[in-house]
């Protein structure tokens, strides 16, 4: 990887972090789009995952007293189920599929009818959110717009 690509990735990570911090959204999607433009799908997924783990993990540490562990457990179980299913069938999205899903993800959350919108207070919804968000993460690398609706 050239120094120019590394510099572009570092600058993009910084700028999209500011976008997320200021607007509270969209930074991860922009970052993933740039990663997919410059890297292969597996490389983009790993780099985005490590970046998100660092930023979201730190945020979880800072806000740990506000975590609803019931919601966390349900989400974690759903995530594990989706991850297990993907591991069994060994699906890796192609770049065109990843870009298409990345592009439609913001509209999925807005297009859901009221009765299908995920709600943290409703029974089983944290589990369902874990499944849906993990599938989106494994296909497009982002799930923020769906998680925001949740």
Residue ranges of each PLM-predicted region?
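Membrane-interfacial loop-to-helix junctions in multi-pass transporters
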Residues: 1-8, 119-125
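Membrane-embedded helical hairpins/re-entrant loop segments and their flanking transmembrane helices
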Residues: 105-150
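Transmembrane helix exit motif
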Residues: 56-64, 87, 91-124
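Small-residue-mediated transmembrane helix hinge/kink sites in multi-pass secondary transporters
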Residues: 33, 83-87, 91, 149
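Residue-level recognition of pore/gate-forming positions within transmembrane alpha-helices
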Residues: 52, 79-83, 103-106
């Amino acid at each position: 990887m050239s120094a120019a690509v590394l510099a572009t990735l570092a600058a993009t990570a910084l700028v999209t972090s500011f976008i997320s911090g200021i607007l509270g959204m969209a930074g991860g999607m922009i970052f993933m789009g740039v990663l997919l433009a410059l890297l292969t799908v597996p490389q983009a997924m790993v780099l985005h995952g490590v970046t998100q783990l660092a930023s979201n993990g730190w945020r979880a540490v800072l806000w740990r007293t506000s975590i609803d562990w019931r919601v966390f457990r349900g989400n974690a179980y759903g995530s594990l189920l989706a991850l297990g299913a993907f591991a069994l069938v060994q699906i890796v999205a192609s770049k065109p599929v990843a870009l298409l899903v990345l592009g439609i993800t913001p509209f999925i959350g807005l297009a859901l009818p009221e009765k299908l919108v995920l709600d943290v207070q409703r029974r089983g919804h944290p589990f369902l959110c874990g499944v849906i968000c993990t599938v989106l993460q494994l296909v497009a690398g982002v799930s923020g717009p769906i998680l925001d609706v949740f």
